């Protein structure tokens, strides 16, 4: 059975903790009755309640004591409510804390704006030293969790709610800097996918158009700088698909890193959901759906696209 990103994280961390006694798990009122880590390692599981900032601060102390803490809470509460703690803990102290943030984007759907998070990449990408990942599918999530557990570096891992996705093929156990899921004519447009829904839409658009598709997992400045160089060696026109605000997202970062290339964005824009609905309905209301991606590819092919201004806000 294919697991969601959140469930794959919990399962992989539980497995790793059986061999590494320094791994500990903290949740902010999200553990539930059947958390696999709590069942397998009850003395290393802490449910701290609705106290996200305090949870991150606790994790910093555990890291200073030689442990490898993984903390998890909804993305809006991790990246926004606890932003100060993330800045001081992951940034200033460079503590080896991994934050796993489900409910990213608008995967919270009918829970509404309080449970949506379209700004987390902008916040975390501005904190130096934090490794940022947005895995797609179970295999990538497991690989990212394993890497974070080994590294001892601060991480922010972005995932959705309960949706499952078929993993992209991986050659080996390590994630490539750029996963070229499909490579076409270098003179044509290249889709660049970010996160779960950005990748789902890009896969569908690639199947419909035959353009190249490059998938990114690691989104911090260090990784994106290297990825941008690889992208530019193969293509010069990119449509970036991401479930994030235009400001501070990956498209804007790539536009700055690739000034000689054409970069346009298909994202969540600058609006707020005004009606309820499921995940995909809320995305569509914000302008993020397959027709929007296909339109962006078509416009770029015909020279009618609106590029992301390097040094300015994405449109």
Locations of regions flagged by a protein language model:
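Thiamine diphosphate
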Residues: 1-145, 149-156, 160-315, ...
